[in-house]
């Protein structure tokens, strides 16, 4: 059975990757590519925009019209667009995959409300490798407990606008949940000046923004005489796009609810 997929944010870096990824996936069909009204790319051929040759599908700017033909929408846009995307999918009953990061509490609450009506997948990262890293981070935290200091270091390209990354926060949340800690209370974001001795109950976050780094995440568990580092490095954004398409094929036709990539992968 073919899954009919629409993409919003089609002219963006990830949008173009998604167009290519849908074309490469078995059992998936791109039925709509949408960009913001007024975009210079509206009317362009989606395939030519993605660099894969002409598809005969023009980029549009009417999201609800695009959803009428789709089983599922993939959204990699900006947090301020999330509310409109959720409302459009609720109106049309369309399943949704959200890859947008940097969502605030109000946007997350709106996402949960939408999950009462439509099936949606929300994940900070759609890479299979990153989601395995989340599982490994949980296993390490469970085994090591409070005997180690835990730091999360992430690096991305200079154009990324949110920090720490959604993936770094997800890693921190997974570790905190495993250890029975409240991440809001124990997270330390960067250090400067005379900080005093480190509190072992804290989870540290360090952020690097430089060059064209696609994405790197390390969870460091440092104890007496040894340390463990769990690291994932992405060398190409196509891994994220392919994972999002996999999630779209998985969520189409599911019961309403909020799912994540761990559900998609059966982890």
From Swiss-Prot:
HAMAP family (UniProt xref): DapB (MF_00102)
What PANTHER family has UniProt attached to this entry?
4-HYDROXY-TETRAHYDRODIPICOLINATE REDUCTASE 1, CHLOROPLASTIC-RELATED, DIHYDRODIPICOLINATE REDUCTASE
* Species the sequence originates in: Alkalilimnicola ehrlichii (strain ATCC BAA-1101 / DSM 17681 / MLHE-1)
> Which EC class, in a word?
oxidoreductase
What gene name is listed for this protein?
Answer: dapB
> What keywords tag this UniProt record?
Amino-acid biosynthesis, Cytoplasm, Diaminopimelate biosynthesis, Lysine biosynthesis, NAD, NADP, Oxidoreductase
Q: Which GO terms describe its biological process?
A: diaminopimelate biosynthetic process; lysine biosynthetic process via diaminopimelate
Name of protein: 4-hydroxy-tetrahydrodipicolinate reductase
- Give the binding site residues for NADP(+): 36
Q: Which residues form the active site?
A: 156 (proton donor/acceptor), 160 (proton donor)
Q: In which pathway does it act?
A: Amino-acid biosynthesis; L-lysine biosynthesis via DAP pathway; (S)-tetrahydrodipicolinate from L-aspartate: step 4/4
The UniProt GO MF terms for this protein read: 4-hydroxy-tetrahydrodipicolinate reductase; NAD binding; NADP binding; oxidoreductase activity, acting on CH or CH2 groups, NAD or NADP as acceptor
